[in-house]
Amino acid sequence: MKYGRLMALVLMMAALICLPLAGCGSEAAAPEETEDAGVVVDLSTAEDSPEWVGQLEQAADAEQIFIVAGIGETTATVSMHQKDSDGNWKQIMSTPGFIGKKGLGKTKEGDAMTPVGTFHFTQAFGIADDPECAIDYYQVNEDDYWSGDQREGYHYNEMVNINDYPDLDTENSEHLVDYDRQYQYCLNINYNEEGVPGLGSAIFLHCMGPIKPYTGGCVALPKDQMVIVMQNVQEDCVVVIDSLKTLSPETWEELEL
């Protein structure tokens, strides 16, 4: 399927998932515009989140939740929700997104799959200037790599400086500035936080690339939506990744997917 046709399909499905249940997207949240084209969401005017969001097990003890709900092999509807002062879930943003080329269910390095489970964001970084990120942000440079070096002591699945590890296995590591479109803004998802060699590395939330309607295992959003996430993310944000069919069977059935 051509990229444009696939994007149109994903947009339609994302709208269908949100609109019957609650307002979808940032327009309903009456956001305050910023010079970075992002939004700092005012929860007092934001739309209610879809009912199924608050019914998730992960939502019970969370104040903010980020959901990647797979709807196709490489597509997802991606949304962020936050409790207001009364404990009601409000939708900060919702957008189409891309997941791994081979879908959901990551188990090893290089399988081109996005992991399923409950995670957290551990690090905010990117090639671009700080977009007024709500948590600490690091602007990467030419010396920064994400280590895919499985040798002991080379910090597999961590950001490293090449000057500290001059013999780093760069072939299997990511030179972050080389991904000039995708890594404008990134949040690291703490999949394989223990750094078990071969289990997988460099699983990020990042901006969409220019051509491919999938990722190597990360989650990709339009750049403007990524800015919204960066400007509203909390340190304790809970990240949930699974299929929509698993997260909300009723919604899946209503959409006849």
Language-model region placement:
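Bacterial N-terminal signal peptides that target proteins for export
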Residues: 1-11
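N-terminal non-cleavable signal-anchor helices
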Residues: 11, 29, 40-42
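Hydrophobic helical h-region of N-terminal Sec-dependent signal peptides
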Residues: 11-17
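Sec-dependent signal peptide cleavage junction
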Residues: 17-38
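Short, solvent-exposed beta-strand edge segments and adjacent coil->beta transition regions
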Residues: 28-32, 63, 216
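Cell wall/extracellular polymer interaction/catalysis modules
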Residues: 38-215, 225-237, 241-257
